[in-house]
Amino acid sequence: MKPRVLYVTHRVPWPPDRGDRIRTWNILKFLAQRADVDLVCLADEPVSAKTRKALEGVTRRLAFVPHAGPRRYVRGALSMACGRTATEGLFESRQLRSIVKLWSSNAEYTAALASSSGIARFVQPPYVKTAGRVWIDLIDVDSQKWLDYQSSSRFPMSTVYGLEGRRLRNLESKLASDVDRM
């Protein structure tokens, strides 16, 4: 019996036409050659039939969670106001949580993998109940990106970017100690 992997991505990995999509697509192909992969992705644009077909060809189970519009920015601001990162709020999704919980209750995963720090919580308890290993692929270190924005911006955005960068750095450090691979 093949291992079973849950892969949660912050964007649809097809078509592989830019950095993060190229990376997540290559990881997905690699995993699919070795395991049965259940893929759930946030979709910030409509998913075409061609995209669906390409991803169905390499997954056991597939779900797209619509994730566009101004409400995500409100969630990001509220998250930041509550002491978390804006990134975590931007990627918050009740539907994503529900799918992960449902799939996890019906399958025993050998591993669970998330494609960014902003969605890392979705591959850890209490959302995933049965993952042997938890992996997080930061793709790029978002905390450094925000700290770089801080140094090239003026007040008040420099303050916001700096706060996000520091909070994300703390989150990334915590994840490094909480998960099996990063």
Residue ranges and their predicted role:
Residues 47-49, 117-123:
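Short, well-ordered alpha-helical microsegments
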